[in-house]
Amino acid sequence: MSLTADPPACTVPAAGGSSTHKLVNGGAEKIIFKIKSSNNNEYRIAPVFGFVDPSGSKDVVITRTAGAPKEDKLVIHFAPAPADATDAQAAFAAVTPAGTVTIPMSATA
């Protein structure tokens, strides 16, 4: 089971902007994920919870509001998805994360 992010890093203007990243499931089983941010004041992530089908991908949009330039990160926790799961947020609470992917985020002046 593997999950990768493409592109692997995010650079946005400190004045605000957005970046789209693709989570790619390189494995043969469905993955469930949850995204955590080191800065919830200036970044918005959509979706925070979700599924990625086997050999599939899911787009994640990172949006930054205006603020001081600084370095932050997203950490994507993932695990095999329960077979009967339809609500990612509810199902994630019942799984033990199997790994993480970190996306460094840089806000530039």
Swiss-Prot record:
Location of the MSP domain: 2-109
Pfam families assigned to the protein according to its UniProt record, in alphabetical order: Motile_Sperm
Tissues showing expression: Expressed at higher level in testis.
Protein name: Sperm-specific class P protein 10
Lineage, top ranks: Eukaryota, Metazoa, Ecdysozoa, Nematoda, Chromadorea
